[in-house]
Amino acid sequence: MARIAGVDIPRDKRVEVSLTYIYGIGLTRAKAILAKAGVNPDIRVKDLEDGDIQKLRGATEAFTIEGDLRRQEGMALKRLQDIGCVRGRRHRMSLPVRGQRTRTNARTRRGARKTVAGKKK
């Protein structure tokens, strides 16, 4: 397996698809990286030469990916929670952040139903 940005990318897939296994790189960004590095996107990772892998490593360094990106996103959420804005409070309470309704729906964000005992007759 080729190792780029600390991630083992699959050998049997096309380079274009394999790059998407790196957190922060989708298909569009993978195509841009391949164009910048001058690597054929249709070639399989196992057929890449060492020089091509080095070019890809250099091209991916221009982007914020993997651990740095995860840390950046986490710090952005923490900042919202620390300043106490509405978005931060909604994140803290595990509720939808962008104004969706919560009286019904929002099950994914709120989790499974918690049954409240009814009044006995």
Swiss-Prot record:
Keywords: Ribonucleoprotein, Ribosomal protein, RNA-binding, rRNA-binding, tRNA-binding. Residues 97-121 are annotated as: Disordered. GO terms for molecular function: rRNA binding; structural constituent of ribosome; tRNA binding. Disulfide bonds: none annotated. GO terms for biological process: translation. It comes from the Bacteria. InterPro entries: Rbsml_uS13_C (IPR027437), Ribosomal_uS13 (IPR001892), Ribosomal_uS13-like_H2TH (IPR010979), Ribosomal_uS13_bac-type (IPR019980), Ribosomal_uS13_CS (IPR018269). Residues 100-121 have a biased composition (Basic residues). One of its GO terms (cellular component) is cytosol. PROSITE patterns: RIBOSOMAL_S13_1 (PS00646), RIBOSOMAL_S13_2 (PS50159). Part of the 30S ribosomal subunit. Forms a loose heterodimer with protein S19. Forms two bridges to the 50S subunit in the 70S ribosome. Located at the top of the head of the 30S subunit, it contacts several helices of the 16S rRNA. In the 70S ribosome it contacts the 23S rRNA (bridge B1a) and protein L5 of the 50S subunit (bridge B1b), connecting the 2 subunits; these bridges are implicated in subunit movement. Contacts the tRNAs in the A and P-sites. Belongs to the universal ribosomal protein uS13 family. This is Small ribosomal subunit protein uS13. It comes from Synechococcus sp. (strain CC9902).
